[in-house]
Amino acid sequence: TIRTGVRVTAVVPEAKGARVELEGGEVLEADRVLVAVGRRPYTEGLSLENAGLSTDERGRIPVDEHLRTRVPHIYAIGDVVRGPMLAHKASEEGIAAVEHMARGFGHVDYQAIPSVVYTHPEIAAVGYTEEELKAQGIPYKVGKFPYSASGRARAMGETEGFIKVLAHAKTDRILGVHGIGARVGDVLAEAALALFFKASAEDLGRAPHAHPSLSEILKEAALAAWERPIHL
């Protein structure tokens, strides 16, 4: 049963689960409680006002392309600035900020930042989505390859899922890669590298991949995007 428009006022751990108290006095008994309400920037205790800084309407600290705030010698990174709240995104921003402090340059390619949902099967993505490409009027082509056609996936008993490669319809440059399946978060690390170095679907499709491995699914999807599929 899915209930909407309900406000939880308290969750109390008990010996055999938890008691969930709702607004209005209703109480639910649960075996497990999953907290999935999203996150928000947390800047309490940073004394931003003392530094002459403030947050935007979403609680984030505004920064420029070099992660500098409006106070030039103060930088901000991670969950308190724009972009996805991902640890590896924050790490890249930290490196870029320090590079800018030391050398006067520093850059993060946000299109090459992968995101992974660690469910079973995993879900992962990097780069543009089809919806974003359509909204921007960018012509693209799609290549897909299923886990069910992978020898390694079949040997693992993990045949559910696929990987999809989006490439520019004219230049063949990879624009986005999305997938669902076993270890797809690991497989898409190569896709992030491809986006970072502006590789084409042909580049990724021609690169040798070990057999049998899950990485072959990405190779085959790239070949399909290049419009030269082999094993499907």
Outline where the language-model segments fall.
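Short beta-strand and adjoining strand-loop segment in the mid-core
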Residues: 19, 79-86, 116-123
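FAD-site-proximal beta/loop scaffold in flavoenzymes
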Residues: 2, 27-100, 107, 205
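Glycine-centered tight beta-turn/hairpin loop motif at sheet-sheet or coil-to-beta transitions
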Residues: 23-25
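Short, hydrophobic/aromatic-rich segments at coil-to-beta transitions
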Residues: 16-19, 139-140
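Short, surface-exposed charged micro-motifs
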Residues: 10, 52, 66, 164-166
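Conserved beta-strand termini and adjacent loop/short-helix elements that scaffold enzyme active sites
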Residues: 5-7, 58, 143-145
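A conserved short coil-to-beta-strand element within the FAD-binding core of flavoproteins
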Residues: 4-16
